[in-house]
From Swiss-Prot:
This is Small ribosomal subunit protein uS19c. The lineage of its organism: Eukaryota, Viridiplantae, Streptophyta, Embryophyta, Tracheophyta. The keyword Cell membrane does not apply. It is found in: Plastid, Chloroplast. GO terms for biological process: ribosomal small subunit assembly; translation.
């Protein structure tokens, strides 16, 4: 189910404050965050945000095409390494 249009998009308060501070200073700096549920808003465009994937922080450069998506969509949490090989020969 999508979020109601009456509500604003969710952005973590600490993340919003950091971005607004960098926008007023006109600086570019990597912002480290664990907030994967935060929605990307237009004020984030041009910033690099390091999003936690459960193991490490992946730096993601925010572009205008990402607006409206969640931060967690761009930091995959699992790596699929393929299915186990068939060991029928070794069992015989």
């Amino acid at each position: 189910m999508t979020r109601s249009l009456k509500k604003n998009p969710f952005v973590a308060n600490h993340l919003l404050r950091k971005i607004e501070k960098l926008n007023t200073k006109a600086e570019k700096e990597i912002i480290v965050t664990w907030s994967r549920a935060s929605t990307i808003i237009p004020t984030m465009i041009g910033h690099t945000i390091a999003i936690h994937n459960g193991k490490e922080h992946l730096p993601i450069y925010i572009t205008d095409r990402m607006v409206g998506h969640k931060l967690g969509e761009f930091a995959p949490t699992m790596n699929f390494r393929g299915h186990a090989k068939n060991d029928n020969r070794s069992r015989r």
